[in-house]
Amino acid sequence: MSAVVTYLRLARLIVHLLVGLGKVGLLFPFLSAVGREARVQRWSRQLVAICGVRMRFDQTLQAQPVSPALIICNHISWLDIFVINTLHTCRFVAKSDIRGWPLIGWLCEHTGTIFIARGRARDVRRIYEGLVKSIHDGERVAFFPEGTTAPQGTVLPFHAN
């Protein structure tokens, strides 16, 4: 890939992120849960396309009705969240440090990310209760039990908290 194409993709990605921040800040407070999910799904599809990722899903997977679920994922890239959201939007569990990241932390917080303070036993109970409530409310919740990214085909030890 040429340097020009790389810089154009990066510029499109930055603009896409800024547009997403604007939509979350200005539109999300007035949208229903279904409306927010549709926008997250569309935004994620566009982001994945900007990055040049091609996806292919099994037709039976696409045809499944959206239902409450707890999804356990192997984390291989920062794109994982967006790839998952292209099929069915989810709330994700993430380390609390992410909340402090400029722009990304705000975006995660306002799109329903559930933050956990690693190593704090009391926080595990709070997260558990939040997960149960989300699933009872009909949402899908996803998390990466390895707690970090790993090369494709590699499974790291799971973190209990």
Task: Describe each model-derived feature in a short phrase.
Residues 1-56, 106-111:
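A transmembrane-helix-recognition feature enriched in membrane-embedded lipid enzymes
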Residues 49-161:
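Soluble catalytic domains of membrane acyltransferases
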